[in-house]
From Swiss-Prot:
One of its GO terms (biological process) is L-valine biosynthetic process. One of its GO terms (molecular function) is dihydroxy-acid dehydratase activity. Residues 1-23 are annotated as: Disordered. This is Dihydroxy-acid dehydratase. Pfam families: ILV_EDD_C, ILVD_EDD_N. Pathway: Amino-acid biosynthesis; L-isoleucine biosynthesis; L-isoleucine from 2-oxobutanoate: step 3/4; Amino-acid biosynthesis; L-valine biosynthesis; L-valine from pyruvate: step 3/4. The modification N6-carboxylysine is found at K132.
C-alpha cells in the first residue's frame, strides 16, 4: 500500500492523462515517444529549455537538458522535453529588434505555462541562459505552481587582451572610445574578437548573472549553481543534481509558492544589492512577485537598499566577473555573510528541501583572505545598496537609478531631449553632448517603445567618450545590466501615457539627486499644465503583431511591466 500511494503521489497530476481505459488513446501516443508499460505510473516531468545558437548564452542548454533527462530517468521519472524561445539582448542592442527583448519574457512565461499545464506535468525543470529566460521561466513556474526548479546555463568566462579581462560591455564601450579617437583600430578589432571566448551568459554581474543569483537566494536553484561557468564540468553535474532534487520535491509535495514568499523576495533583493546587480532585477522581481500573488513594491527595494552594503567588487562598475565570485565562495558565501549580519531570513524554504540557514550551515561567514572579490562586511565598497528608487515631479510613480562606481551621485543641468534611442545615439557619436548635460530618452517605455529597450549603446558610448561622470541620462526605457554611470531608468509614468517626462523641453533644467532620491524637473506647475494641455498622444508605432498586442496589454514599469 505504501508503494502504491507513493507512485500515485509521484504522478499526482499526470494520472489524468495516463490512467484508466478511457485514456488508452493518450497512452497510445505516449508509447510512440518511448513510454512502455511500466512508465505510466511514473512522474512525467517537463524539461523546458531555450537551446539556441542565436547567442552564446543559450548555445549549451541542450546539452544540460540531456544531463537532466538522464538523471530523471535514473530516478524513475519520465522527462518530456520542449523548447521555448530566446532573444539575445546583446545582439539586438541598439536596434529595432531590442523592442522584442522584454516581450520575450512574457512569451517565455506563457509558453512554459501553456505546455506544462496542457500536458498535466507533475514537475518542471527550466533551463535558461539569456537575460529574459530567467524571469520568463520563473513567472511561468509561479503560475503553474507545480514542483519546479530552475537550472542556469552558466556564465561565460572572460576574454583577455593586453592583460585585462574583457566582457561584452568592453566592446560596447570600445565603440565610444574608438569613435572619440581614444582607441586604435587594432585595439578596437582585437577587443571585438576576444571579448566572448565561448558559451555562457554575459560575464559580469549583468542581468543574467543577477537574476541567477537572485534565484539562488530565493531558493529556486541549487546552492553554488548561479555563478558556475557554462563550460565547466561542474555545471553538468549541477544540472543532474537539480533533476534529482526535483524528484525529492515531488515526493515531499514542495511547490514554488511554498518557497517564493515575501521573505524569499526580500532575500533576493538583499543579495542583488550586496553583489551590485542589475537594475533589471527591480522590474523582473516585481513581475515574478505579481505571478506569485506577493505584494512587492518599489518601497521594499528602497527599504532594503538603505540597510544593505555592496561588498562584492564586480563588473560593470567593479573589477571582477561572476566566475571570479564563484572561485571565492559564490552566492552561498555572500548569503552567509548577510545571514550573520541579520539581513537574510534564514527560515525560508528552498529546493533542497532545507531552509536557507540549513543550506548555509557549513559555509564560512567571512571572505577568504588574500582576495578582493568579496570584501569584509564591515569594509564594503559602498555602505548602502546601489539601486536607488528616485521620485519627484519627473517620476511620480518612481524610477530606478544605479549609483555604484560614480564619483558623484547628483547632477543638475540642461535637458537634451530625444524621442528615440537612435536620435540620442547619433547625437552622442556626433559629439553634440557635452559635460553637464542631462540626456532624456523618452517614448521608449513598455507601451511607447513598445518593449522598453535597454540603453546600453548610448550609456556605453558616453563612457567611451569620457563623459561617464559628467553627463546624466534619464529614460522611460531600461538599462542593460552592463550599464553604469549617472543613469535613471524605468521613469514612470512613461511618456506614451502622458507622464511628466513627455513634457520636458530642450534646455529645461533637470536635477538628478541619488543622495536624496529625487528626480526633479525645474519647471513651474503652471507651465507644466500648459504643456500638458497641448500634449497629444502619439500614434501607436505598431498596429498588428506581437508588439502591438504587447503595447495594448502591458502595465507600468513601476509595477513590473506585467501583461496579466
Amino acid at each position: 500500500m505504501t508503494d502504491t500511494r507513493t507512485k500515485r503521489r509521484m504522478n499526482w497530476n499526470s494520472h489524468h492523462i495516463t490512467q484508466g481505459d478511457e485514456r488508452a488513446p493518450n497512452r497510445a501516443m505516449l508509447r510512440a515517444v518511448g513510454f512502455e508499460d511500466g512508465d505510466f505510473d511514473k512522474a512525467i516531468i517537463g524539461v523546458a529549455h531555450a537551446q539556441s545558437n542565436i547567442t552564446p548564452c543559450n548555445n549549451g542548454l541542450g546539452e544540460l537538458a540531456d544531463h537532466i533527462t538522464g538523471a530523471l530517468r535514473e530516478g524513475g521519472a519520465m522527462p518530456q522535453v520542449y523548447g521555448t524561445i530566446t532573444v539575445s539582448d546583446g545582439i539586438s542592442m541598439g536596434t529595432e529588434g531590442m523592442k522584442c527583448s522584454l516581450v520575450s519574457r512574457e512569451v517565455i512565461a506563457d509558453s512554459i505555462e501553456t505546455v506544462s499545464r496542457g500536458q498535466s506535468h507533475d514537475g518542471l525543470i527550466v533551463v535558461g541562459g539569456c537575460d529574459k529566460n530567467m524571469p520568463g521561466a520563473m513567472i511561468g513556474i509561479a503560475r503553474l505552481n507545480i514542483p519546479a526548479i530552475f537550472v542556469y546555463g552558466g556564465t561565460i568566462k572572460p576574454g583577455h587582451y593586453q592583460g585585462k579581462d574583457l566582457t561584452i560591455v568592453s566592446v560596447f564601450e570600445a565603440v565610444g572610445a574608438y569613435g572619440a579617437g581614444k582607441m586604435s583600430r587594432e585595439d578596437f578589432e582585437q577587443i571585438e574578437k576576444r571579448a566572448c571566448p565561448g558559451n555562457g551568459s554575459c560575464g559580469g554581474m549583468y542581468t543574467a548573472n543577477t537574476m541567477s543569483s537572485a534565484f539562488e537566494a530565493m531558493g529556486m536553484s541549487l546552492p553554488y549553481s548561479s555563478t558556475m561557468s557554462a563550460v565547466d564540468a561542474e555545471k553538468a553535474v549541477s544540472a543532474a543534481d537539480s533533476a534529482r532534487a526535483l524528484i525529492r520535491l515531488i515526493e515531499q509535495d514542495i511547490r514554488p509558492l511554498d518557497i517564493l514568499t515575501k521573505k524569499a523576495f526580500e532575500n533576493a533583493i538583499t543579495v542583488v544589492m550586496a553583489v551590485g546587480g542589475s537594475t533589471n532585477a527591480v522590474l523582473h522581481l516585481m513581475a515574478i512577485a505579481h505571478a506569485c500573488g506577493v505584494d512587492l513594491t518599489l518601497e521594499d527595494f528602497e527599504r532594503i537598499r538603505e540597510r544593505t552594503p555592496v561588498f562584492c567588487d564586480l563588473k560593470p562598475s567593479g573589477k571582477y566577473v561572476a566566475t571570479d565570485l564563484h572561485e571565492v565562495g559564490g552566492i552561498p558565501r555572500v548569503m552567509k555573510m548577510l545571514l550573520k549580519a541579520g539581513l537574510l531570513h534564514g527560515d525560508c524554504l528552498t529546493v533542497t528541501g532545507q531552509t536557507v540557514a540549513e543550506n548555509l550551515a557549513d559555509v564560512p561567514d567571512q571572505p577568504d583572505p588574500g582576495q578582493d572579490v568579496i570584501l569584509p562586511f564591515d569594509q564594503p565598497l559602498y555602505s548602502q545598496g546601489h539601486l536607488a528608487i528616485l521620485r519627484g515631479n519627473l517620476a511620480p510613480e518612481g524610477s530606478v537609478a544605479k549609483i555604484s562606481g560614480l564619483r558623484q551621485i547628483k547632477i543638475t543641468g540642461p535637458a537634451r531631449v530625444f524621442d528615440s534611442e537612435e536620435e540620442c545615439m547619433a547625437a552622442i557619436m556626433g559629439d553634440q553632448i557635452k559635460a553637464g548635460d542631462v540626456i532624456v530618452i523618452r517614448y521608449e517605455g513598455p507601451k511607447g517603445g513598445p518593449g522598453m529597450r535597454e540603453m546600453l549603446s548610448p550609456t556605453s558610448a558616453i563612457i567611451g567618450k569620457g563623459l561617464g561622470d559628467s553627463v546624466g541620462l534619464i529614460t522611460d526605457g531600461r538599462f542593460s545590466g552592463g550599464t553604469y554611470g549617472l543613469v535613471v531608468g524605468h521613469v514612470a509614468p512613461e511618456a506614451y501615457v502622458g507622464g511628466p517626462i513627455a513634457l520636458v523641453q530642450e534646455g529645461d533644467i533637470i536635477e538628478l539627486n541619488a543622495e536624496t532620491c529625487e528626480l526633479t524637473l525645474h519647471v513651474d506647475d503652471a507651465e507644466l499644465e500648459r504643456r500638458r494641455a497641448a500634449w497629444v498622444a502619439p500614434e501607436p508605432r505598431y498596429r498588428r503583431g506581437v508588439l502591438a498586442k504587447y503595447a495594448r496589454l502591458v502595465g507600468s514599469a513601476a509595477r513590473g511591466a506585467v501583461t496579466d
